[in-house]
């Protein structure tokens, strides 16, 4: 039986299948060693969650306690408060009897614990209060985490993923309350990460918002190509594949150095070259079209939801992905405008998740294979 396809995508990538992020992990470790606050901003498909889970392993190896919370999983403040309190407590205390005693002492929370046949504890908390008191329970949980970390003489790192979802709760009231509590803490570092870049930036760059200048902003960019190339080549060599270095660089060009794109291109390449084990330039050029065909139903749905001006703009951007959409040259070349109309289309497409706006103000396709669909597959339905 041959080696399984090592290029994983679409989920959490762990162990030997995780591509290099050494510099980013080193930087985040340094920040957390100093118990700072970091806002990690990243477009989707850049491997943010995989990076954070890899980071947790490294921090635990250095005797730091870690709690990871994905806000996508919690629809309201009550569930968020319960998760934060339970996960931070479990990170610092593993003795189930002590946890039970600890949870029994909360004013706003009541314990809900289950133990499997092997004696492993699974701790969760339910709120015993009305919705209007949920914020008080969250703050109680944050205070408890600080007190327990102090008692244990341990550094605690709290990672809140998809942090932009905080806005779905009760607006800026919770932001102010969380900031106030964080500023009192001395044993906890925080990483607030999010893929909704426009929402994240509004939260942390607006002087009127509570998180303004609470911590540094770190943008997660592409993986350094040299290290990533070695990762890809090592797996291809293990699988007995033959590829030219220049041809491999073309994969990074097509994928725009986006980790998800590279992983998927290599995944399709591995499968399509399995019989010959020889990767030729013609195959590499076909890869994005193969992927665009695979995802055509998804692109068709997005296309049908776009207005005519938005479709025209998307066609133009698919042809000129590095230009500025407000430039006169771009507008004249593609016969679009005025700038106010372009701005309205861009804002709508960003909101739909078709495009994303970079920290530098540029606009890119959220899905790097959609331009190939527009240019090749989508011609029949324009």
Where are these regions (language model features)?
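Short, locally clustered residues in the helix-turn-helix/winged-helix DNA-binding domain
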Residues: 32-33, 256, 270, 315-322
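A short, basic N-terminal segment
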Residues: 1-38, 43, 372, 380-382
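C-terminal leucine-rich, beta-strand-based interaction scaffolds used for sensing/assembly
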Residues: 2-5, 246, 293, 297-382
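Amphipathic alpha-helical "lid/sensor" segments that cap RecA-like P-loop NTPase cores
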Residues: 229, 233-297
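Alpha-helical sensor/transducer elements of the RecA-like P-loop NTPase core
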Residues: 50, 189-190, 194-236
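P-loop NTPase nucleotide-binding core
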Residues: 36-37, 41-46, 50-157, 188, ...
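Sensor-1/coupling segment of RecA-like P-loop NTPase cores
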Residues: 150-157, 165-170, 178-208
């Amino acid at each position: 039986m041959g080696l399984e396809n090592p290029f994983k995508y679409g989920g959490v990538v762990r162990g030997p299948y995780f591509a290099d992020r050494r510099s980013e992990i080193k930087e985040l470790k340094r920040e957390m060693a100093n118990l700072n606050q970091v806002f990690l901003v990243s477009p989707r498909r850049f491997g943010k969650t995989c990076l954070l889970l890899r980071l947790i392993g490294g921090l635990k190896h250095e005797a730091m306690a870690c709690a990871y919370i994905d806000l996508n999983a919690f629809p309201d403040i009550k569930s968020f408060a319960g998760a934060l309190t339970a996960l931070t407590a479990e990170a610092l205390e593993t003795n189930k009897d002590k946890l039970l005693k600890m949870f029994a002492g909360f004013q706003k929370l009541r314990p809900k614990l289950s133990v499997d046949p092997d004696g492993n504890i699974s701790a969760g908390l339910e709120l015993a209060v009305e919705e209007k008191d949920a914020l008080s329970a969250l703050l109680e949980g944050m205070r408890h985490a600080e007190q327990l970390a102090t008692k244990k003489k341990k550094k605690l790192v709290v990672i809140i993923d998809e942090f932009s979802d905080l806005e779905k709760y009760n607006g800026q009231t919770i932001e102010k309350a969380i900031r106030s509590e964080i500023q009192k803490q001395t044993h906890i570092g925080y990483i607030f990460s999010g893929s909704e870049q426009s929402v994240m930036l509004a939260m942390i760059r607006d002087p009127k918002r509570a998180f303004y200048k609470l911590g540094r902003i770190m943008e997660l960019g592409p993986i350094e190509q040299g290290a990533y190339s070695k990762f890809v080549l090592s797996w291809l060599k293990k699988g007995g594949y033959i590829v030219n270095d220049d041809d491999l660089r073309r994969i990074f060009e097509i994928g725009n150095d986006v980790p998800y794109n590279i992983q998927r291109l290599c995944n399709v390449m591995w499968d399509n070259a399995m019989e010959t084990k020889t990767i030729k330039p013609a195959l590499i050029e076909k890869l994005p079209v193969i992927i665009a065909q695979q995802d055509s139903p998804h692109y068709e749905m997005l296309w049908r939801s776009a207005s005519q001006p938005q479709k025209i703009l998307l066609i133009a951007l698919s042809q000129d992905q590095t230009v500025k959409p407000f430039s006169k040259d771009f507008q004249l070349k593609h016969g679009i405008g005025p700038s106010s109309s372009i701005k309205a289309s861009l804002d709508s497409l960003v909101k739909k998740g078709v495009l994303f706006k970079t920290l530098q103000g540029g606009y890119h396709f959220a899905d790097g294979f959609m331009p190939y669909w527009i240019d090749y597959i989508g011609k029949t339905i324009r």
